[in-house]
Amino acid sequence: MKKSFFEYLMTQRNPQPNNEVEEFANQAFFDQVFPKQSRDFDEISKYLELNAGYLQSMSIFDSAWQRYLESEQF
């Protein structure tokens, strides 16, 4: 069964983040209304653009999304 993007993102959490994706994961963990079950790029992207002040750049999401897609190929 495929993971949602949020489930994947939670595997990237790190108490001492080494990169922007890890920091994104740490912040998303505390986001109570993040679309946790979604696997839809457009839905998550739109949500982040409108609601995620903690995400400094959408390119961070793009990078995390690419890693997510790569992880789902196996």
Swiss-Prot record:
InterPro entries: UPF0346 (IPR010673), YozE_SAM-like (IPR023089), YozE_SAM-like_sf (IPR036806). Signal peptide: none annotated. This is UPF0346 protein PEPE_1063. It comes from Pediococcus pentosaceus (strain ATCC 25745 / CCUG 21536 / LMG 10740 / 183-1w). NCBIfam families: PRK13672.1. It comes from the Bacteria. It holds the Pfam family YozE_SAM_like. Belongs to the UPF0346 family.
